[in-house]
């Protein structure tokens, strides 16, 4: 099953001609999940030909303008594409007020259901039979959340040789075993799925962290992520400035990635003081701590692969 992340915008504070504000879209087959909705999100969705009609849920980190001002336009646009499914908007306190006020002031025409969920306590905020999204507190100048999208374990691989050895003929009985059901073999014995299936296999994990001072505890929340998107707003040596503004340097983000043993980290939410050519400084500093670091770029996409 395909799982990929699209960087819709990688900038922080203000948009630049070549850099939209922070927004990341995760696509799992036909389902879309948006993490933050900065200014320029609609433009990026159009350029990437992504079907915003299929966005299931939008997860907002906090209500600073550079993370949420793209939301009203996206809500209005969704009324123009015959959306039928409800849209979930999930975030910390003030998200519901922002959505409701925007609808009133802009006199929005909305022809689909919007379900807003404000997070009061960290934990699971969205789930299906195959995956869940968890939230956890960050430390910024207003209530701010990080998120992890994690698939549940998959069944182990089916062992046809084991099935044959247990006198289970090829056909519908094999399918039942793979579906988690017991069957009766040709010689009348009860065969359990675990008799012919290998160990369960790990699902994939995506984590999104932006706008927070350095917290070592973040590493536990994003542990073993396949793809970790994390703010790296400033270069090494600016730790004091970052702490005062409740942001992180690129090396602090890299330390979290290292401690969490993630597979790959993409820096995001760059300070507008850095041009694209100057971002290499952030990359070089981060790679001193965590070599598997890349720079987010607008319209970049990353495939998340299964381990096996």
UniProtKB/Swiss-Prot annotation:
Cofactor comment: Binds 2 Zn(2+) ions.
E.C. code: 3.1.26.11
Positions contributing to Zn(2+) 1 binding: 62, 64, 140, 211
Alphabetical list of Gene3D superfamilies matching this protein: Ribonuclease Z/Hydroxyacylglutathione hydrolase-like
Top-level taxonomic group: Bacteria
Residue sites binding Zn(2+) 2 per the record: 66-67, 211, 269
Reactions mediated catalytically: Endonucleolytic cleavage of RNA, removing extra 3' nucleotides from tRNA precursor, generating 3' termini of tRNAs. A 3'-hydroxy group is left at the tRNA terminus and a 5'-phosphoryl group is left at the trailer molecule
Listed SUPFAM superfamilies: Metallo-hydrolase/oxidoreductase
Protein keywords: Endonuclease, Hydrolase, Metal-binding, Nuclease, tRNA processing, Zinc
Cofactor list: Zn(2+)
Active-site residue numbers: 66
Pfam families to which the protein is assigned, alphabetical: Lactamase_B (PF00753), Lactamase_B_2 (PF12706)
Top-tier EC class: hydrolase
GO molecular function: 3'-tRNA processing endoribonuclease activity; zinc ion binding
PANTHER family assigned: ZINC PHOSPHODIESTERASE ELAC PROTEIN 1 (PTHR46018:SF2)
Complex and partners: Homodimer.
Biological role: Zinc phosphodiesterase, which displays some tRNA 3'-processing endonuclease activity. Probably involved in tRNA maturation, by removing a 3'-trailer from precursor tRNA.
Family the entry assigns: Belongs to the RNase Z family.
Protein name according to UniProt: Ribonuclease Z
Organism from which the protein derives: Treponema denticola (strain ATCC 35405 / DSM 14222 / CIP 103919 / JCM 8153 / KCTC 15104)
């Amino acid at each position: 099953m395909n799982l990929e992340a699209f960087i819709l915008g990688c900038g922080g504070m203000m948009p630049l001609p070549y850099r939209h504000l922070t927004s990341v879209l995760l696509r799992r087959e036909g389902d879309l999940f948006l993490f933050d909705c900065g200014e320029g999100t609609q433009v990026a969705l159009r350029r990437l030909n992504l079907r915003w009609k299929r966005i299931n849920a939008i997860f907002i980190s906090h209500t600073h303008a550079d993370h949420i001002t793209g939301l009203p336009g996206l809500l209005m646009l969704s009324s123009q594409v015959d959306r039928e499914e409800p849209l979930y908007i999930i975030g910390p306190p003030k998200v519901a007020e922002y959505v409701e006020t925007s609808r009133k002031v802009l006199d929005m025409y909305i022809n689909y259901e919007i379900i807003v969920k404000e997070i009061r306590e960290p934990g699971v905020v969205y789930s299906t039979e195959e995956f869940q999204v968890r939230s956890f507190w960050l430390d910024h100048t207003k209530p701010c959340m990080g998120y992890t999208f994690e698939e549940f374990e998959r069944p182990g691989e089916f062992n046809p040789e084991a099935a044959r050895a247990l006198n289970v003929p090829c056909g519908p009985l094999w399918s039942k075993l793979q579906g988690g059901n017991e069957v009766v073999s040709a010689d009348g014995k009860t065969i359990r799925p675990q008799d012919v299936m290998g160990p369960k296999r790990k699902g994939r994990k995506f984590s999104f962290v932006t706008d927070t001072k350095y917290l070592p505890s973040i590493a536990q929340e994003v542990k073993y992520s396949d793809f970790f998107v994390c703010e790296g707003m400033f270069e090494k040596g600016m730790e004091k400035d970052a702490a005062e503004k409740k942001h992180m340097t690129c090396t602090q983000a890299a330390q979290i990635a290292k401690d969490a043993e993630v597979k790959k980290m993409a820096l995001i939410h760059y300070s507008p003081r850095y041009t694209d050519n100057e971002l290499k400084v952030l990359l070089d500093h981060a790679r001193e701590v965590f070599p598997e670091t890349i720079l987010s770029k607008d319209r970049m996409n990353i495939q998340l692969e299964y381990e096996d």
